[in-house]
Amino acid sequence: MVEEICHICNDKSTGKHYGAISCDGCKGFFRRSIRKRYHYQCRFEQNCDVTKNKRNACRACRLQKCVKAGMKSNAIQNERDAIGKRKKTTGAEKEDLIDQLVAAETLCQQLRSSVIKNTSSLAPYDCGKVKWNYEDARAATLDDIGKSIHQQLVLFIEWAKSLPQFSFLAQADQAALLKGGAASIIVLGVAYRSICLTVENTICLANDTLLPKEHATQVGDINCVVGRIIDEIVNPMRRLNMDLIEYVALKAILFFNPVVREINDQSPVENARYAFLRSLQRRCTDKALENMEDESMDCRSGKLLLLLPSLQAIAQQLVEDVQLARLFGLVNVDSLMEELILNDMKPSDPQILQTSLASPVNSSVKAEVELEE
């Protein structure tokens, strides 16, 4: 007997729902979209790839595919929610949060690909399938490292601004979170981008230049940072086979840190972190069930959370290296890096962060993120 697949995302189907053969994920997505009367917009040309691993990337194209597959909105207009409110606030809430995070990450990748000329055409969801041409890949220079940090900072701000949990905060608390989490988020992003590499002991920067561990000594005193990123973050991620959903959840948990300096109202930050933590735990449970693994939810999510102390320690070392590089004139430390990485702005200096927070999402990316051809 041939097992049917979901006609929307090609995942394993659980039967016919609202008129189409689909999985529970697409069933729930369609139900929520119709009941809450969501109106989605595609940022591209309404032809995004909707597969099991990418179905959360574009909700407009996913809903469009649900309709094309045969799902009928009138099939749920008068349907009673037999699941009840309690279950709705667990599974449905978890997927809504994950949708937010994946959408925010997708936005960053879209912005990144529009400003970095050497960006691979593959999205982050294909990370495990990336095949690098190492003969053509360029080794990173010290200038690449400085530019990469700047570019990631700009995208980091836009990522944060796209999250509802962040936009509800007072601007002073937004700035405190950005300053407190910038270096850690940079380290996490570099590490996740590097797990797809098939070559050993190498990290991949935001502009797709490669920095092997043995080459790091030639581009300033960052050899230790590169080695620690590989040994303490990249290799454990590979062993755990971390996926995109786990990555975006861990990124949010790392970012919404209620104990960073200068936070005035910790409560909404704590609530956001706890919600994302629940999402990560549920994702780990789902993954264990999908793969029929004996590993418990707590065990897998615990292993992922154990990456956080190393991420923060490496981030602090990165900050110290940037300070030394600036002291010896090895790298151009611009105002954004001074404000977010070094937290070394004078009251009289222009506050780039304040301006960025006051502007709409994506309004300053084209002006801020530049790469010389």
Curated annotation (Swiss-Prot):
Annotated GO CC locations: nucleus
Domain NR LBD: 93-344
Phenotype when the gene is knocked out: On a temperature-sensitive daf-7 mutant background, enhances entry of larvae into the developmentally arrested state known as dauer, and also suppresses exit from dauer. Up-regulates expression of the potassium channel exp-2.
Upper classification of the organism: Eukaryota, Metazoa, Ecdysozoa, Nematoda, Chromadorea
Start-end of DNA-binding region: 3-78
PANTHER family assigned to the protein according to its UniProt record, in alphabetical order: NUCLEAR HORMONE RECEPTOR
GO biological process: cell differentiation; negative regulation of transcription by RNA polymerase II; regulation of transcription by RNA polymerase II
Annotated family: Belongs to the nuclear hormone receptor family.
Keyword field contains Amino-acid biosynthesis: no
Alphabetized GO MF terms: nuclear receptor activity; RNA polymerase II cis-regulatory region sequence-specific DNA binding; SMAD binding; steroid hormone binding; zinc ion binding
InterPro entries reported for this sequence: HNF4-like_DBD (IPR049636), NHR-like_dom_sf (IPR035500), Nucl_hrmn_rcpt_lig-bd (IPR000536), Nuclear_hormone_rcpt_NR2 (IPR050274), Nuclear_hrmn_rcpt (IPR001723), Znf_hrmn_rcpt (IPR001628), Znf_NHR/GATA (IPR013088)
Function in brief: Orphan nuclear receptor which, in cooperation with R-SMAD daf-8, modulates the Insulin/IGF-1-like signaling (IIS) pathway, perhaps by regulating expression of the potassium channel exp-2, which in turn modulates the secretion of insulin-like peptide daf-28.
CDD domains referenced in this protein's UniProt entry, alphabetically: NR_DBD_HNF4A
Protein name (Swiss-Prot/TrEMBL): Nuclear hormone receptor family member nhr-69
Localization per record: Nucleus
Expression across tissues: Expressed in the ASI neurons, hypodermis, and in tail neurons.
Signal peptide range in chain numbering: none
Annotated organism of origin: Caenorhabditis elegans
Keywords carried by this UniProt record: DNA-binding, Metal-binding, Nucleus, Receptor, Transcription, Transcription regulation, Zinc, Zinc-finger
Assembly notes: Interacts with R-SMAD daf-8.
